[in-house]
């Protein structure tokens, strides 16, 4: 076998391989012997068909199969010999085959980039220092009450947290536009669902009033014909409702799994859940800074084949989220996913190098702790832990999570890490 390697462009490689004629012929003869043992031809007993008849009938297809197999095997031998690490599927470029002559073909592919980690000691990470305060628990309890609130009609003017039922008609330069009209439209104030100025124009009005508000569509508005345009909306305010919050009764508290129905029990349960969320948020915040610093400090070429593969993964995930099928997934424009896919490939390659250079392996104690932490959010944690322990795929996924955490910790060990006091709400809003 003769092998030559050339760089086509960037990470592109072209390996040219020549297979000796006698290697091909020996492989063909060997395969024809195997075929002769199995075939049945009228007039001959099984395994007793003369080789010239076997060769006449099956020679062409056997030769084609043998060539394909030899091309694959010689390519593998070549990249092992040349210490090449292909990224993505190779593209075989067969040469012209002539019986009794050496056969030359080429294989084109991309290779993984050579990564030499640098700048780890210059990465700056700010670790949030947070604790869940009584005031944070109070705020969360108020949120829970709001989520369980009922709506009660009121006679007064619209406030910031009320709910209104309206009819509206919008116009630009005196002309109504598509999507600018609705009847019995229910709008919860303060959620930012409408364009800027719309809700502000409703505040202070009472049910039964009809009025006109002036607004301007944002420059980034999705409808091209409305971007930056001044508009008028005629509003008919039909109903105003205010929240009626439930009291912290025993019945209300038991809805959240607090068996004794006490306020103290609810506060303890809420605090426990908030502290679990907080732990994850701090971990994610630190991790994102470490990875961002790693990426900025290490610019690498990325194989297009890996980006294409990651785009397919993201397409399928998007289709699943929105109830689509695989065909619909492949029709989604690659531009929607290209930047995210490239980022994920870069991060994967860099963390992979961190793992390799630090000779990291998944810590089974960490894997166990991660599973137990995740399971603690469920009603029966032991059942979840057992389910994971019996599922190899889930366990492997969790080992990958643990290994990634260990890689991030290896980066943090060399980075400049400082601490910054912050509040629960501030940190959680950063995660949103």
From Swiss-Prot:
InterPro entries: PPIase_dom_sf (IPR046357), PPIase_FKBP_dom (IPR001179), Trig_fac (IPR005215), Trigger_fac_C (IPR008880), Trigger_fac_C_sf (IPR037041), Trigger_fac_ribosome-bd_bac (IPR008881), Trigger_fac_ribosome-bd_sf (IPR036611), Trigger_fact/SurA_dom_sf (IPR027304). Signal peptide: none annotated. It is found in: Cytoplasm. Residues 161-246 form the PPIase FKBP-type domain. It is an enzyme of class 5 (isomerase). It catalyses: [protein]-peptidylproline (omega=180) = [protein]-peptidylproline (omega=0). Its EC number is 5.2.1.8. Belongs to the FKBP-type PPIase family. Tig subfamily. This is Trigger factor. It comes from Klebsiella pneumoniae subsp. pneumoniae (strain ATCC 700721 / MGH 78578).
